[in-house]
Amino acid sequence: MSSNAKWLNKVKWDEHGLVPVIAQEVGSNDVLMFAWMNRDALAKTIESGEAIYWSRSRKKLWHKGEESGHTQKVHEVRLDCDEDVVLLKVEQVGAIACHTGRHSCFFQKFEGDAKEGDWETVEPVLKNPETIYK
């Protein structure tokens, strides 16, 4: 599949050629993570049926789970009303989406009020990240 496919032109890419992506678990509707895609990543995601993102730090395509085995099988791809955010409905293989070894990257919850509040960890580590990554 070409990253010049007509359907890719509908996406409003930012000035760096990227679009924000939210990965949501298809069964539970849990928000698992936030990442970025370029045209190539989105085209390869559609083609392969697994989530492939763009790593801004490494400046390369990143097949989610390539090291850990915690891949994301894509069930749906949606584009928001402004056409500038992509939602992936995924099946998270191995139940771990976060590099910290947790189910979701959104494991910190704000508790309290504006003056005395703080971020609390509300999800357990399911697997030690040192044993996940080589």
Swiss-Prot record:
The keyword Magnesium applies. NCBIfam families: PRK00051.1 (NF000768). It holds the Pfam family PRA-CH. It is an enzyme of class 3 (hydrolase). One of its GO terms (cellular component) is cytoplasm. Mg(2+) binds at residues 80, 82, 84. It comes from the Bacteria. Zn(2+) binds at residues 81, 98, 105. It is found in: Cytoplasm. One of its GO terms (biological process) is L-histidine biosynthetic process. This is Phosphoribosyl-AMP cyclohydrolase. Keywords: Amino-acid biosynthesis, Cytoplasm, Histidine biosynthesis, Hydrolase, Magnesium, Metal-binding, Zinc.
